[in-house]
Amino acid sequence: MAQYTIECVETRTEADNGQYGKFVLEPLERGQGTTLGNALRRVLLSNLEGTAVTAVRITGVNHEFATMKGIREDVLDILLNMKELVLRSYTSDIQIGRLAVQGPKRVTAADLELPTEVQVVHPRHYIATLAEDGQLEMEFQIERGKGYRAIERGSEDGAAIDYLSIDAIFMPVRKVNWTVESERSAANVEQDRLTLEIWTSGSLSPQEALSQAAKILVDQLRPLQEITFEPPAEPQRSAPNTVGQVPIEELQLSVRAYNCLKRAQINTVADLLEYTEEDLLEIKNFGQKSAEEVIEALQDKMGLSLPKDKPARS
């Protein structure tokens, strides 16, 4: 099994609490850098679970185009800010968060009331600004999922009628870059050096994201290690007619020869092969000409010959 090292050569936390990690995998066999880099990037961007707000209910609001007294943002702006909220959930169950604030106030994610299973990644994330007479009360739905889920207009997926659905961005990984460099070993063998750069929203560290992506790939490939290939079952064929089942009518003999054989209880080719030429000549009214006719018919139509000696009967 090929062995390689994985080194985290750089990490940092961004201003919005997003995280960056840079990893180097080496030495890899030639071509494996591209294989691993491409596969890991696709899984990192598409298959990792994340958490997002999927629906919001705002007191006094029944559609997304409304405005609210004493609040700088309209409802669409508030929904957009909630959509960009970065959360980390430790449960797969749907959770409910709440917000109740009175102006004047600059509302951020730190003001949200969240279940114990849910954590805000960036507490300073901006939501709205309230004037002195402003008041904002809302309830929002939190879910785990993968990728990007667009809402279906006219479908509320079972949510209460006064909930406003939001396009959900579950992806915890924002961006992935990978590069492959060729290098030569001490034995002058060409090898790959894979560099992976991972940017996350902060709900996962780059190390966690890489580990989860690798596990998903392994789980997808493991069944291929255990698969057993069985040859396709051959279609059942009906047993071909044996010589014993071919009636003497198939030999198309003359009436004289045919009647003589029938009177001697010779009904099939198998019966006929119990007789030598001398035996046939002993049949009443069966002459040399009839014997030659039978011998020729057996050879031409069946590729068979009469035995030289009488077969031993079991």
Curated annotation (Swiss-Prot):
Keywords: DNA-directed RNA polymerase, Nucleotidyltransferase, Transcription, Transferase. Residues 1-228 are annotated as: Alpha N-terminal domain (alpha-NTD). CDD domains: RNAP_alpha_NTD. Residues 241-314 are annotated as: Alpha C-terminal domain (alpha-CTD). One of its GO terms (molecular function) is protein dimerization activity. The keyword Nucleotidyltransferase applies. InterPro entries: DNA-dir_RNA_pol_insert, DNA-dir_RNA_pol_RpoA/D/Rpb3, DNA-dir_RpoA, RBP11-like, RNAP_asu_C, RNApol_insert_sf. It catalyses: RNA(n) + a ribonucleoside 5'-triphosphate = RNA(n+1) + diphosphate. One of its GO terms (biological process) is DNA-templated transcription. The keyword Transcription applies. GO terms for cellular component: cytoplasm; DNA-directed RNA polymerase complex. Its EC number is 2.7.7.6. SMART domains: RPOLD. The N-terminal domain is essential for RNAP assembly and basal transcription, whereas the C-terminal domain is involved in interaction with transcriptional regulators and with upstream promoter elements. DNA-dependent RNA polymerase catalyzes the transcription of DNA into RNA using the four ribonucleoside triphosphates as substrates. Belongs to the RNA polymerase alpha chain family. In cyanobacteria the RNAP catalytic core is composed of 2 alpha, 1 beta, 1 beta', 1 gamma and 1 omega subunit. When a sigma factor is associated with the core the holoenzyme is formed, which can initiate transcription. This is DNA-directed RNA polymerase subunit alpha.
